[in-house]
């Protein structure tokens, strides 16, 4: 009994009434924020690392993994600096300013994961339109919540789905007990063959408190014996440091200027190895090398045709468009085991 009393005093375990009141404050927090501010432009930095833990020939049939499977390398890194245009609390346009990647041709790999880096924590859908946020009033019926309040003015909320579904997540969040503002949150789930853990640190005040300031995503893609691990990190709200004329540039020196934190030794090593291979390849001017390049380009073209979408506009002023889905699409594969 004494221990229970001490626990209640130290941790402020919430009653059902207190829990409902706190959740109500969290759900209502977006309405307490003035979003009538003028449109804004800010900048973001993204760094990612891909590791091929296991692979077989079937990985070649995944459209967004063709270049990784075909490259022969097991580790890839990349970074990007983007211009973000906002309207109220929504991102309306993202422009790539700088990028650097060891993925061949700077191709996008698992592009769906980028959507996880801009979660709409208070929205009805947390990520794009396929995962339901536990911090929206309309989704409360799908989740179970537990809360523990602390004397520092914060409360920890843990949540889990009432039923198993790939559209629901589990995790925890730290919120301001008085206002219901979410300070940090972690979401764990699985969707479309991707297991993920997403950690979010929210902005501090005003409209920025409705948006992530920093995100870290750990994800694993598993498909018929293949396993790709990835780590994505993003930082938002960075200042303007470059001229507006800079777009989609591959410039290491400029990235050194805008990068909000240094690369890890492991990232530096992968970049250095990639650049060393590129220098060696550029110095190889033999006929055999030219033949290898031609063969590689032919295989790249085959891969793009078989596994990538083909789209084209036609007519004056682009009045019509044509899109052909991949000839081989793993999402339509069937298998049993």
Q: How does the language model describe each region?
A:
Residues 11-12, 147, 152-250:
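Gly/Pro-enriched, hydrophobic low-complexity segments
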Residues 2-12:
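Hydrophobic h-region of N-terminal signal peptides that target proteins for export
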Residues 36, 40, 185, 213-215, ...:
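Generic beta-strand hydrophobic packing signal
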Residues 52-55, 186-191, 223-227, 328-335:
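Flexible, membrane-facing loop/turn or short amphipathic-helix motifs
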Residues 65-67, 78-85, 133, 142-147, ...:
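Ordered hydrophobic segments in well-structured contexts
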Residues 92-155, 159-170, 194:
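Flexible, processing/modification-adjacent segments and terminal tails
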Residues 13-110, 262, 267-268, 275:
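Solvent-exposed N-terminal domain segments of exported/luminal and surface proteins
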């Amino acid at each position: 009994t004494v221990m229970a009393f001490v626990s209640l005093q130290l941790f402020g375990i919430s009653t059902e009434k207190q829990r409902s009141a706190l959740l109500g404050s969290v759900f209502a927090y977006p309405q307490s924020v003035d979003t009538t501010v003028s449109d804004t432009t800010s900048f973001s930095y993204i760094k990612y690392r891909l590791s091929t833990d296991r692979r077989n020939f079937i990985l070649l049939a995944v459209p967004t993994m063709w270049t990784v499977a075909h490259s022969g390398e097991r580790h890839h890194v990349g970074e990007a600096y983007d211009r973000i245009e906002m309207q109220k609390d929504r991102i309306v346009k993202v422009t790539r300013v700088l990028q650097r990647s060891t993925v061949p041709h700077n191709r996008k790999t698992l592009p769906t994961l980028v959507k996880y880096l801009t979660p709409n924590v208070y929205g009805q859908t947390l990520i794009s339109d396929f995962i339901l946020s536990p911090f929206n009033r309309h989704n409360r019926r799908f989740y179970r919540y537990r809360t523990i309040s602390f004397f520092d003015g914060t409360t920890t909320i843990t949540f889990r789905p009432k039923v198993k579904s790939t559209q629901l997540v589990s995790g925890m969040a730290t919120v301001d007990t008085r206002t219901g503002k979410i300070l940090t949150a972690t979401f764990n789930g699985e969707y479309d063959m991707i297991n993920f853990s997403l950690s979010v640190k929210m902005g501090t005040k005003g409209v920025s408190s409705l948006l992530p300031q920093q995100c870290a995503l750990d994800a694993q893609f598993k498909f018929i014996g293949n396993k790709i691990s990835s780590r994505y990190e993003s930082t938002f709200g960075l200042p303007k440091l470059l001229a507006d004329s800079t777009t989609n540039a591959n410039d290491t020196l400029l990235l050194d200027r805008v990068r909000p934190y240094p690369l890890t030794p492991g990232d530096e090593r992968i970049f250095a190895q990639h650049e060393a291979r590129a220098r060696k390849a550029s110095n190889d001017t033999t006929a055999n090398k030219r033949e290898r390049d031609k063969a590689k380009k032919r295989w790249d073209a085959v891969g793009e045709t078989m596994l990538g979408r083909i789209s084209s506009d036609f007519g004056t002023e682009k009045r019509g468009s044509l899109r052909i889905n991949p000839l081989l699409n793993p999402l339509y594969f069937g298998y049993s085991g």
